[in-house]
Amino acid sequence: MVVLATGVRANLDLVTQLGLDVGQLGGAVVAPTMQAYRRGRLVPDVFLAGDLVQSESAVMPGPTMSQLGSSAVKEGRVAGINAAGGKALSGPVASPWVSVIGDLQIAGTGLSQGLASWYGIETVSGKAAGSTRARYYPGGTPLTVKISADRVSRRIVGAQIIAGEDATGRINWLTAAVVEGVTADDFLVRAENAYCPPASMVQDVAIKAAEDLCRRLNQ
């Protein structure tokens, strides 16, 4: 098997034909209403969404390219409401994702340590491993959670998960922390998880990863 990861590039043919503004990341520039710009001014009745637009980042100042189906649906809803005469705004994105490869679910949100370094953000990461169910309960699968935070502000900037099941719910939980600007300390104080042996451990692995992160931040 050969896996070729080539990335995604926005098709800007229509944007170029209309003379709309394109940003530094190669995506169309839009307002929070998803309305397009031309020479720095909003263009009446032209709304864009999806792979070809730059979105506001929830992690750092400035735009990002969130070329994901979930982002496109969120932006498309806002564009449609405003195009029909309603009022709606699109907020910042953390770009959560999940993939299934064989028996593994791999998920992430926000910035990886490598991408954070590229943006000039020094991060510290905490990691923990456990099971998706109580250790004594049959059917659970191994689960590893990694959480990264800005060393200075201690704000959570990203997370990654590898599991046999239930990665989506956990990454959505951590995405909320990224979007809200929660620090590692606040997450550890405020986070709670539902518990039932067939469905979870009594203390979720994400909380254990946050404990490890706080220890490393304090070193």
PLM features: what roles do these ranges have?
Residues 1, 23-25, 94, 111, ...:
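Short beta-strand-initiation
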Residues 1-78, 173, 177:
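FAD-site-proximal beta/loop scaffold in flavoenzymes
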Residues 4-6, 104-109, 119-219:
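Flexible, glycine-rich terminal cap/loop adjacent to redox cofactors
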Residues 21-25, 86-97, 122-126:
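A short alpha-helix-loop-beta-strand transition element characteristic
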Residues 38-39, 98, 137:
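Short secondary-structure boundary/capping segments
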Residues 49-112, 199-218:
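A conserved FAD-binding loop/helix module that cradles the flavin
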